[in-house]
Regions:
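Enzymes that bind and transform nitrogen-containing heteroaromatic metabolites
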Residues: 1-135
Length: 135
């Protein structure tokens, strides 16, 4: 749903030459290839739901860092399996509407997964928070 709802580009938009990130999509649904995500880059699509196996395949491809842009369900799946060592969260005052889903509820807070707030920055009216895994 995140891909359809947000229509992200997921690329580096800078004024100098740079390597673009390798785009990987984890989905159980068919996707509209006209979405921004599919432009400018090859996309690997995984329909397998075994996240640990998918992460192992990334290691086999010599990935040294993975940025996960996900909705609450997938993000929490990665957290519950212990596959996350850093969380970067952006908070905005903009209303998301009635389809928005809360990331972390009271009994499912970031701290419950062993993360500690490392830094917090104000960017215009938004807040960027970086959480690191303890230990």
């Amino acid at each position: 749903n995140t891909l359809r709802n947000d229509n992200p580009r997921m690329n580096a938009r800078v004024n100098f030459p740079t390597n673009q990130p390798k785009k990987i999509l984890l989905t159980s649904k068919d996707c509209d290839k006209e979405l921004n995500f599919f432009k400018d880059n090859d996309v690997q699509i995984y329909k397998n739901k075994d996240l640990a196996q998918i992460i192992k395949s990334f290691k086999d491809q010599d990935f040294c860092s993975i940025l996960i842009e996900a909705g609450p369900k997938l993000a929490n799946s990665f957290l519950q399996l212990g596959l996350v060592d850093e969380i970067i969260s952006y908070t905005s005052n903009n209303e998301l509407g009635d389809k928005a889903v809360s990331w972390f509820k009271e009994n499912n807070a970031i701290e419950n997964y062993g993360f500690k707030l490392e830094s917090s920055y104000k960017i215009d009216s938004d807040i960027k928070e970086v959480f690191k895994k303890n230990g």
